[in-house]
Amino acid sequence: MQAPPSFYEGDTLEVAKKLLGQKLVHIVDGIKRSGIIVEVEAYKGPDDKAAHSYGGRRTDRTEVMFGAPGHAYVYLIYGMYHCFNVITAPVGTPQGVLIRALEPVDGIEEIKLARYNKTDITKAQYKNLTNGPGKLCRALGITLEERGVSLQSDTLHIELVREEEHISSQYKITAGPRINIDYAEEAVHYPWRFYYEGHPFVSKK
């Protein structure tokens, strides 16, 4: 079952925690690639100095953040790595959640090929398939083409995991500072990174 539009509404920190344990799905050339979300970061611009929309900054890149919740915000870092975010909060309130890491589930062979251009990989390489925002986008084939796409689409969405299959019973949710935002002054210390403690696919312990 796809997460309905209402799933993405409300407080961004709560939406971030709700995303943990759900499945991010991208259909590429008719093949389903997916992973269970195990690490996220919340960004609450315009008051969050770590957010692209801090101060109400509105550009061609950030325009989608000002739109309806439940859409994809994809951007490039270092000119080469894509990052996938879920837009939250009401229209005009530019907030979102960065998906930082996944546990791969569907389309494993395609994911391996996307990451390493081969399917015969080591255990260490397997652990590195989707344990970072750029890695998971490459693995799932998410690019700037997906910026602004509704997460109600057939090809890109969040799939709700049934309670009896949800991994929240196996891992404790831990909160801590976000990663690689040294420029963000006091926002560096906000505990807005949420992850499953001890999960092997978390990007940073």
Curated annotation (Swiss-Prot):
EC number: 3.2.2.-
Domain of life: Bacteria
Gene Ontology annotations of biological process type: base-excision repair
Keyword Metal-binding: no
Keyword rRNA-binding assigned: no
MF annotations from Gene Ontology: alkylbase DNA N-glycosylase activity; DNA binding
Pfam families membership: Pur_DNA_glyco
UniProt keywords, alphabetically: DNA damage, DNA repair, Hydrolase
InterPro entries for the chain: Formyl_transferase-like_C_sf, MPG, MPG_sf
Entry similarity comment: Belongs to the DNA glycosylase MPG family.
Name this protein carries in UniProt: Putative 3-methyladenine DNA glycosylase
Taxonomic path: Bacteria, Bacillati, Bacillota, Bacilli, Bacillales
